[in-house]
Structure formats: structure tokens, C-alpha cells
Curated annotation (Swiss-Prot):
Keywords: Cadmium, DNA-binding, Metal-binding, Transcription, Transcription regulation. This is Transcriptional regulator Rv3488. Cd(2+) binds at residues 16, 30, 34, 101. Homodimer. InterPro entries: Metal_resp_DNA-bind_regulator, Tscrpt_reg_PadR_N, WH-like_DNA-bd_sf, WH_DNA-bd_sf. The lineage of its organism: Bacteria, Bacillati, Actinomycetota, Actinomycetes, Mycobacteriales. It comes from Mycobacterium tuberculosis (strain ATCC 25618 / H37Rv).
Length: 107
């Protein structure tokens, strides 16, 4: 997966985990709806890394009659999401805003 797509997947995960508890199967479906093909071999290491970084917490729960690990954003995860949103807004303004930038002019 390319770096920009990894960052987008991270942003999606934090976005959804900030509002609700999420689990891997649901995230796979949700990401697929947005055009991302994320295998379990990519998704679960990403979830584990976000948890190790203190951005998510998880616990085992019964969901739809099955034992599943559910994830939710921590306060640090919500703060990271806010920072990511700001960075994305700035990038979108620069790249999609229609502004002309000349190399070397400092803008």
C-alpha cells in the first residue's frame, strides 16, 4: 500500500474510532466502500501499531454473537485526528485550491 493510502486508512480508522467502537471486519467493509482494498494482513498490524502508539485502546467483546476485538480512540488518538484533519485541510487548500505557485518564490 502506498504511503498516502496508508495515511488515509489511518485517518479513516481514527475518524470512526473517535465516534464509535469499531472492529476489524467492519473497518474492512467501511474502507472498501471508500475504494480501499485493505487485507487483514495490512489492517490488523495498522490497528496494533495505533494501539501501541497510544492512539487506540481495545478490548475483547461479543459483537453479533461473536467474540471480537473492538477499538476506540484514546484522547491522544482524538488529538492526532484533529492534527491530521488540519494537515489534510491545508494540503487540500494548497493542492486543490487552484492557487498558482512558482518554484522558488517562497509560497
Amino acid at each position: 500500500m502506498r504511503e498516502f493510502q496508508r495515511a488515509a486508512v489511518r485517518l479513516h480508522i481514527l475518524h470512526h474510532a473517535a465516534d464509535n467502537e469499531v472492529h476489524g471486519a467492519w473497518l474492512t467493509q467501511e474502507l472498501s466502500r471508500h475504494g480501499y482494498r485493505v487485507s487483514p494482513g495490512t489492517l490488523y498490524p495498522t490497528l496494533h501499531r495505533l494501539e501501541a502508539d497510544g492512539l487506540l485502546v481495545s478490548e475483547q467483546r461479543v459483537v453479533d454473537g461473536r467474540a471480537r476485538r473492538v477499538y476506540r480512540a484514546t484522547p491522544a488518538g482524538r488529538a492526532a485526528l484533529t492534527e491530521d484533519r488540519r494537515a489534510l485541510e491545508e494540503l487540500a487548500r494548497e493542492v486543490l485550491g487552484g492557487q498558482s505557485h512558482t518554484a522558488g518564490n517562497g509560497t
